[in-house]
Amino acid sequence: MIVKRPVSASLARAFFYIVLLSILSTGIALLTLASSLRDAEAINIAGSLRMQSYRLGYDLQSGSPQLNAHRQLFQQALHSPVLTNLNVWYVPEAVKTRYAHLNANWLEMNNRLSKGDLPWYQANINNYVNQIDLFVLALQHYAERKMLLVVAISLAGGIGIFTLVFFTLRRIRHQVVAPLNQLVTASQRIEHGQFDSPPLDTNLPNELGLLAKTFNQMSSELHKLYRSLEASVEEKTRDLHEAKRRLEVLYQCSQALNTSQIDVHCFRHILQIVRDNEAAEYLELNVGENWRISEGQPNPELPMQILPVTMQETVYGELHWQNSHVSSSEPLLNSVSSMLGRGLYFNQAQKHFQQLLLMEERATIARELHDSLAQVLSYLRIQLTLLKRSIPEDNATAQSIMADFSQALNDAYRQLRELLTTFRLTLQQADLPSALREMLDTLQNQTSAKLTLDCRLPTLALDAQMQVHLLQIIREAVLNAMKHANASEIAVSCVTAPDGNHTVYIRDNGIGIGEPKEPEGHYGLNIMRERAERLGGTLTFSQPSGGGTLVSISFRSAEGEESQLM
């Protein structure tokens, strides 16, 4: 927009006219006053001509020797500069005419005075004095008119200045003050968030019109921006409320994991918290192939979302979920899946720690047995050897008793060594499949038979105590097959039934066994049965139709009801 009449130019023009009018009126008045400075002198000199005229008549009548001197004085007074300067263009004609008549008549009178013509002088002196009076009167009127002119010019200048000031102020009021007041009012309304003020007048041809147009555009843009910011603030507020709700959910989930023992109940509680707060239709945590817990019922009309449950790049399982608002639930469930991964990691860490405690305790027992019972058995073997040497060989009864005693002592020593080996079992893995693989790899070095493993038993179904008992049963069964079955292949398989029952099979392709009976003084099978009872299960021996031996351990974990397939 082009500014046609800028405020600065309009104000400058108005002030210029005011100053110009002031200068003109003041200048004319000053010039007029300057020209009046010697008016009084001119009037005085003109008035003195009357007295000098009478004095010349007296000198002429009395024959005074000063007549010529007085004539010269009159001549000087009549032609004084203050009177001769009256012959200018701005002096009224009446003044100049009167002055010209005085000069002309003075020539005649001066001539008569030089001739001494007293009668003529006396006859014309009064007329000449009257002319002087008229000249003085003309000078007086001229001076008065100049004063009136000064007054008139000053009055006209004052009226002109007042008029210019009035119109300037009026214009400033309409074109500057009023628009500025509107701008102030509109600014105050905008300050209070009110953008519905009437549009400002944009028709003004000055900067304020341009400012009003720009302000209207700014107000419109601010209105749009303000509404946009309000919408953004509302959105951010909703996001903050949503984030707060999610943090509360995550806090509740973290509190569910903040227990001394992380088990399946903790994971189910987490799924319940998420389902209650996120309104998810279905949640399912899968760990391995045979262990999962779920909340809700799956909806076939909704897609199943899957998130990996990981910790330190290790995948522990998957989190399946269904929700009608996938985008809003996904960030929370990502965090929940990470939390479940940490929970599974700490579950295995706790189990590993408990296993280490058990292993340390069993190693301590093994050391105590070795330091006590093993030393006693060794001492008995030495004493038995000495006793054999002291008994005659022809004493058959004593020799038979000594042979039985020696056999029993050897069996006790062998069983003690096996027991010490069992107590010194060390495993570095916390989850059941890895622990079984580690144990079988160790046994594989002791046999030519092929050891295979198929473990589908969920590690979360067992705590550390149960897992150690199960490992010991499997180890004892595999060792028995290695020693007595003459087998070329020994297979270990672990499965979980849909009802939550777990079964471990140790099968070999060896010679098979009949009724499982232990020789007198052997307790391996009894120990295996006792361990199975501690698992809350049963130990059975059978001969499959294909030959060999099948050892079965069936049990139900403490959380068996939680690990059913749902």
Swiss-Prot record:
SMART domains noted in UniProt: HAMP, HATPase_c
Gene3D superfamilies: 1.10.287.130, 1.20.5.1930, Histidine kinase NarX, sensor domain, Histidine kinase-like ATPase, C-terminal domain
Protein's cellular compartments: Cell inner membrane
Any GO BP annotation: cellular response to nitrate
Principal location class: membrane
Domain Histidine kinase: 364-559
EC numbers, comma separated: 2.7.13.3
All copies of domain HAMP, residue ranges: 174-227
GO cellular component: plasma membrane
Keywords: ATP-binding, Cell inner membrane, Cell membrane, Kinase, Membrane, Nitrate assimilation, Nucleotide-binding, Phosphoprotein, Transferase, Transmembrane, Transmembrane helix, Two-component regulatory system
Example GO molecular function: protein dimerization activity
Periplasmic side: 35-146
UniProt superkingdom: Bacteria
Official protein name in the record: Nitrate/nitrite sensor protein NarQ
